[in-house]
Amino acid sequence: METTLRAALIAWLRADPALPDMLNDIHEEAPPAASLPWLQIAASASADWSMKDRRGREIRIAIELHARGDDPAETGAMARAIEQRIAAMPPALPGCRIANIIFLRARAEQRAGHRRAVLIEHRFRLIEDRQPMENRP
C-alpha cells in the first residue's frame, strides 16, 4: 500500500492546477536535474493498521520543498498550497482507500546559498478494498 500511496500522492500533486506553475519539478525522489524550487518525497514509513476483517496500513510520508530566496513568505505560500492539496486528496486508490489524512508537522530551515527547505509530514491511514482476510488463500 505504501508504494501505491507514494505514486498516487505524486500524481495528485502534479495534477494540481497551481502547483506546477510554482514548482519546477514534483518527484518521488530527488530529481536528477531540476532548478529550484522543487518538491520530493523525503521519506516514508508504514506500520500495520489492520482491522478485524481488513488489512490496513498507517503510512507516514515526509515531503520536502526545496526553494531559493530571502523571503520566507514565498516559501511559506508554496508550503501552504502543498498542504492544502494533500488534505484534498481523494480517498480512492488502486486496491485500497484512504481512511484519513492527518497533518503531523512541518519544519522550515534556511540553508547556505539562500536556499530554503520545508519538510512537511502527514499520516495516511489506508484500508484494503479487497476481500476480507479470512477469505484469502
Walk through the language-model features, giving the residues of each.
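Small/polar-rich, solvent-exposed N-terminal microdomains that initiate assembly or binding
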Residues: 1-51, 81, 89-93, 134-137
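Acidic-leaning, charged glycine-interspersed low-complexity segments
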Residues: 19, 36, 84-137
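Oligomerization/assembly interface segments of phage tail-like spikes and tubes
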Residues: 55-69, 116-127
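Mid-chain, well-packed structural core segment of small domains
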Residues: 66-91
